[in-house]
A protein has these predicted regions:
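Charge-rich, well-structured scaffold segments of protease-associated domains
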Residues: 2-76, 90, 96, 107, ...
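Short loop/turn motifs at secondary-structure junctions and domain boundaries
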Residues: 84-87
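Active/ligand-binding-proximal structured segments within catalytic/core domains
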Residues: 100, 107-158, 232, 357-370, ...
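Basic, alpha-helical interaction scaffolds
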Residues: 377-378
Length: 512
């Protein structure tokens, strides 16, 4: 009797367990079907690093289907990218006048402001040793009054328009530009034409401006980065016009005369040496450029009437460059000063000209190397290596293009006892591009590279950048870096900086 009772209880408990199991299974199925929005939380005994791994996996899944609003131009899903901004960007219109002067405009009538400027292919490269500094001196004197406008009248006219008039000089170009309201564009063009064709160059004001330029030279001399790059050009392009400084030596500034300035204008400020931003680096001409609230036809007619006294000198800058080419010389210059707190140096290779087909690839390489500053936080590729090891204060990859050559390399600032490690890290990152290029690094550099220095349609620019693949990077790196001469400029406590032969060997041998 007792055994029969126990068997009955056993069968009843099994039926209850089966019913409970079926109910739980049904509830689980319903829950799975209705609640798929959030994954179940991890069990309590799961380790912290396991939870982090699950989070990483979740992020990777989201990256496989990114938001199309944030896709880059070279996205793996280009069909989802929005190219409306490229299609609506204002067209660059170019007109060449009978005297050779070129007029370029980008019209955006919805804008209330405009920028008009004159770009001239004239800089320190086209001076002589005796006149070095006259191009920059001319930039200062161009605002010191004309036959019909005194200095005060010129300043008041610009200020009354609420405008901004400025200029700058480089090794190959000089630019004068004005930022004004759209309705004041004719006045701005009149001012630019007046100062470029009718400047008085009063001897009294010339003598006064000498002191201003000499003080400017002292200020530039205190900017160590400017000093490094001036010395880098001087040693890399020694005994060539491109090695001259923009400001010129102090002895030249003290003896430049009105005649020197006028001769420079008549020789280099000719109409056929004015060029649009579209072809600014492909030819040796001069430019009238306007953008914003402007109409192309109106600007062309105004330029025709105003710019009538430009020089007709037939000499082109192409002829000048061919006569005195910038030849790269492997060399170094070191200015040791142990009293300075930090050492800085630049290592440069002979780079590409603006017209070189590999110039875009070098720009991508520059973006791959990146830049970094300790005070600005994290940086890009090589900068992160220097940051992790805390061996540099800052670094910057640079790529400077000229008409027939260029300079490509890295500039760095570091403590004296870290120079050896910094130099090795820099040369390792540069040289390994000849052997190994990561697709991720290449894609990142392409996405960061959005400027070229001259007006190119965005679609063409993106196509040029996207055409650079890993094989192109290695080919260009072997052309410009592998076993090539270098130029070095260094200043500060540079006793521990490796010698020239150490750097030169690491263009072909990656060994500490």
């Amino acid at each position: 009797m007792a055994i029969r009772h126990l068997l009955k209880l056993s069968r009843r408990s099994q039926q209850t367990l089966a019913t409970t199991t079926r109910s739980a299974s049904t509830a689980t199925a319903v829950s799975t079907a209705s609640d798929t929005r959030a994954p179940a939380p991890p069990p309590p005994n799961q380790m912290i690093y396991d939870r982090l791994a699950e989070q990483v996996k979740s992020k990777l899944k989201r990256l496989e289907h990114p938001d199309p609003r944030f896709l880059k131009h070279n996205s793996p899903i280009p069909a989802a990218a929005d190219h409306t901004s490229l299609l609506t960007y204002p067209e660059t219109r170019i007109t060449t006048l009978p005297n050779g002067l070129r007029v370029a405009t980008e019209s955006n009538l919805a804008s209330k402001t405009a920028t008009v400027g004159v770009w001239i292919d004239a800089g320190s490269r086209f001076e002589t040793d005796e006149t070095n500094g006259v191009a920059h001196f001319l930039e200062h004197m161009i605002f010191k009054g004309t036959a019909k406008r005194s200095v005060r009248h010129l300043e008041e006219e610009i200020e009354n328009m609420g405008g901004h008039l400025n200029a700058y000089t480089s090794r190959e170009q000089t630019t004068y530009y004005a930022k004004v309201m759209g309705e004041d564009v004719p006045k701005a063009l009149d001012i630019l034409s007046d100062i470029l064709q009718n400047s008085a160059f009063d001897d009294r004001l010339i003598n006064r401006e000498r002191g201003v330029i000499l003080r400017e030279m002292e200020e530039v001399g205190a900017q160590t980065e400017e000093v490094i790059f001036d010395h880098l050009h001087a040693t890399a392009f020694q005994h060539t016009p491109l090695g001259r400084t923009i400001l010129g030596p102090a002895e030249n500034i003290e003896k430049i005369t009105k005649k020197d300035i006028q001769e420079y204008i008549s020789t280099h400020y000719s109409a056929h040496r004015m060029l649009t931003a579209e072809f600014l680096y492909d030819y040796m001409l001069q430019v009238i450029s306007a953008s914003g609230a402007v109409k192309h036809e109106d600007v062309v007619e105004q330029v025709k009437k105003m710019f009538t006294k430009l020089s007709a000198n037939p000499i082109t800058t192409s002829q000048l460059v061919e006569k005195e080419p910038a030849l790269f010389t492997g060399s170094e210059v070191r200015m040791r000063d142990d009293d300075m707190p930090l050492a800085q140096f630049a290592v440069a290779f002979n780079g590409a000209s603006w017209t070189d087909p590999d110039s875009v690839a070098l720009m991508v390489i520059q973006a791959m190397l990146g830049s970094w500053n300790q005070s600005a936080g994290g940086g890009k590729h090589m900068g992160s290596i220097l940051a992790i090891n805390e061996i540099a204060e800052s670094m910057m990859a640079f790529n400077t293009n000229y008409k027939d050559t260029g300079l490509f390399g890295v500039y760095a600032v570091a403590k004296a006892d870290c120079l050896d490690d910094v130099a090795f890290a820099i040369m390792q990152e540069i040289s390994k591009l000849c052997y190994r290029v990561g697709d991720d690094d290449l894609l990142r550099a392409q996405n960061q590279l959005i400027t070229y220095g001259r007006r190119i349609p965005f679609a063409e620019l993106f196509a040029r950048i996207d055409a650079v693949d890993a094989a192109t990077i290695k080919r260009v790196a072997n052309r410009f870096i592998f076993d090539q001469d270098i130029a070095i400029a260094a200043s500060g406590p540079v006793k521990l900086l490796p010698d020239y032969n150490w750097f030169r060997r690491r263009t072909y041998m990656l060994r500490y």
